[in-house]
């Protein structure tokens, strides 16, 4: 047993308990795979991360990302939250103004703009439209008609998201999915707000007014699907799809989490060929654990 530094971070929010919580073990070296998996099950958060010395000389640190059931090669809110914890604990990047994280998909670049961190969206491992049988299955799960889905796309960038676009943000917010009816889908849903009519609340200024509403559903530990409060990996792949297809401008804000009482905000910006996914963080817990 060893005493290790620990933080719990709320990601994609400026206000505590309105984003997506992340557990970060800052001193993960020496823990076995089984110990990491067991601790992630114990936290029961959507993800728990363990920071380690990098094996890639270009990286500043290495991260391993666990859900309560599996290890992930990449995930978005753990990327931003882990970087926030690493920097706040005294981490010094090799290059001023940017951080390089090593994870299961390789290197992920991050940058800081004021208090906000953003990561460079990794390339999608699979894109293109979904097959029709999958689209119909997703429609049944969401409780909508097939015709309500106006577009669809593979958004696999580690997590194998299968994304559908509805005609409006209001339709996304109105969804009442049958969470127990599926067990192996990873479903992302997006819909646009009318211009200038983003969902207000929780101190939104004009700069934070969302252009899109997003919801995400993933396999739950006890069976069926669960809803994720705010999802960086899905928003990254959605941005690549929506901007590339002309459905979104090169800079926008997405809202996520309203159905769970959250108010996540994901800041998207395309620069050249890179899409940056940004968010604020709040550290709610700092301390030590014995593991």
Label for each model-derived stretch:
Residues 1-74, 80-291:
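Active-site proximal loop and beta-alpha junction motif in alpha/beta enzyme cores
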């Amino acid at each position: 047993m060893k005493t290790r530094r620990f933080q719990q971070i709320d990601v994609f929010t400026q206000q505590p308990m309105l984003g997506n919580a992340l557990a970060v073990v800052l001193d993960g070296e020496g823990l076995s795979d089984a110990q990491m998996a067991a601790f992630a099950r114990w936290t029961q958060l959507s993800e728990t991360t363990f920071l380690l010395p990098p094996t890639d000389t270009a990286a500043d640190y290495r991260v391993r990302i666990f859900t309560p059931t599996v290890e992930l090669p990449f995930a978005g809110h753990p990327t931003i939250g882990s970087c926030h914890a690493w920097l706040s604990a005294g981490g010094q990047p090799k290059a001023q103004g940017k951080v390089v994280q090593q994870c299961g998909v390789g290197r992920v670049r991050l940058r800081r703009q004021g208090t906000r961190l953003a990561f460079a969206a990794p390339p999608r491992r699979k894109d293109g439209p979904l097959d029709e049988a999958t689209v119909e299955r997703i429609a049944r799960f969401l409780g909508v008609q097939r015709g309500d889905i106006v577009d669809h796309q593979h958004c696999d960038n580690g997590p194998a998201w299968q994304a559908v676009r509805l005609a409006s943000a209001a339709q996304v917010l109105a969804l009442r999915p049958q969470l127990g009816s599926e067990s192996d889908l990873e479903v992302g849903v997006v819909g646009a707000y009318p211009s200038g009519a983003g969902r207000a609340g929780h101190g939104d200024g004009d700069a934070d007014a969302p252009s899109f509403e997003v919801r995400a559903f993933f396999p739950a530990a006890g069976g069926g699907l669960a809803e994720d409060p705010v999802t960086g990996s899905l928003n990254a792949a959605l941005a690549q799809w929506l901007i590339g297809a002309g459905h979104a401008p090169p800079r926008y804000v997405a809202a996520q989490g309203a159905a769970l009482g959250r108010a996540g905000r994901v800041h998207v910006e395309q620069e050249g060929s890179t899409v940056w996914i940004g968010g604020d963080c709040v550290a709610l817990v700092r301390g030590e654990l014995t593991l």
